[in-house]
């Protein structure tokens, strides 16, 4: 795996391999340290979980991080994304983690000779979020075939919905969407349903934040009405299968996508997803750098 910009780039075998490595890290297996490697995290959108998770993963792997802040960089002087990245490559950075508001920004970076890991591009792709979600599901079910997955919320503007739909469908899951009519994404070939019609048969309920920053113009939005129609209420939670799970990529708007009392309820896996994120991102970085250097993944001395 030379880089990771889209879930469409991964085969099912590669997905399983990444998950297996992440699980080994989670069990305590020691990584092969990349102490002579440099990484830079370029976040052009706000982030808590993804940015901090990558930073933790990089430290666990022994990588040396070259700090980058958009507010103090030459981007403010009009420098292009490509020239910024080419500059970092030129001074010796070995890999880049990038989040950017532009869909498919990585297509402009094909002239780079170092790997790019996509930390999210507009409403396009969020591959490491999808992989950590898949890891979380795998730990619960060990298989994806015929699992019923319901993704609820702002489908049209969600890179998480797109990445997870593509990956979970390829792995054999049955994916359905629930969303207001104006947030339907017709490019994704999944049925749209009413939550109350399918909640009892669903194995995974995946809730999405409303992407206010990606809506053009004024957004007519009533949080209470949205919660009643598309959120996970206590009644819906109680109607779920006993073994079903609740997921959310976060940040969570309590009382909107999900009742506040349910965020840490027994079926919720929201904070487990966050924990898995560090191990999964360690796995992604390791697979990319180990392949680049033809090295080993685990420290054989441990």
From Swiss-Prot:
One GO cellular component term: cytosol
Taxonomic lineage from the root: Bacteria, Bacillati, Bacillota, Bacilli, Bacillales
Domain of life: Bacteria
Assembly behavior: Heterododecamer (2C3:3R2) of six catalytic PyrB chains organized as two trimers (C3), and six regulatory PyrI chains organized as three dimers (R2).
Described function: Catalyzes the condensation of carbamoyl phosphate and aspartate to form carbamoyl aspartate and inorganic phosphate, the committed step in the de novo pyrimidine nucleotide biosynthesis pathway.
UniProt catalytic activity: carbamoyl phosphate + L-aspartate = N-carbamoyl-L-aspartate + phosphate + H(+)
Annotated residues for binding of carbamoyl phosphate: 49-50, 99, 126, 129, 250-251
Protein name: Aspartate carbamoyltransferase catalytic subunit
């Amino acid at each position: 795996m030379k880089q990771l910009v889209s879930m469409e780039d991964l085969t099912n075998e590669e997905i399983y391999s990444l998950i297996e490595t992440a699980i080994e890290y989670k069990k305590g297996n020691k990584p092969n340290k990349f102490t002579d490697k440099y990484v830079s995290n370029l976040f052009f959108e706000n982030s808590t979980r993804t940015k901090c998770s990558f930073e933790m993963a990089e430290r666990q792997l022994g990588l040396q991080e070259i700090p980058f802040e958009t507010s103090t960089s030459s981007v403010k002087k009009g420098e292009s994304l490509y020239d910024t990245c080419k500059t970092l490559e030129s001074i010796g950075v070995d890999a880049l983690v990038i989040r950017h508001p532009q869909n498919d920004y990585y297509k402009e970076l094909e002239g780079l000779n170092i790997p790019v890991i996509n930390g999210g591009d507009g409403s396009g792709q969020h591959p490491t979020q999808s992989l950590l979600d898949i890891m979380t599901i795998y730990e619960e079910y060990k298989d994806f075939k015929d699992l019923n997955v319901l993704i609820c919320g702002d489908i049209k503007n969600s890179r998480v919905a797109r990445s997870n739909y593509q990956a979970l469908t390829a792995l054999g899951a049955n994916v359905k969407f629930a969303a207001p009519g104006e947030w339907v994404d017709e490019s994704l070939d999944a049925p749209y349903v009413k939550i109350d019609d399918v909640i009892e048969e669903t194995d995974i309920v995946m809730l999405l934040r409303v992407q206010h920053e990606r809506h053009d113009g004024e957004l007519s939005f009533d949080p209470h009405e949205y919660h009643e129609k598309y959120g996970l209420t206590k009644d819906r939670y109680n109607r779920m299968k006993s073994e079903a799970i609740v997921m959310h990529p976060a940040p969570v708007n309590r009382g909107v996508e999900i009742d506040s009392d349910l965020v840490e309820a027994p079926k919720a896996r929201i904070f487990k997803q966050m924990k898995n994120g560090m191990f999964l991102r360690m796995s992604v970085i390791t697979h990319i750098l180990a392949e680049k250097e033809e090295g080993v993944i685990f420290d054989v001395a441990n």
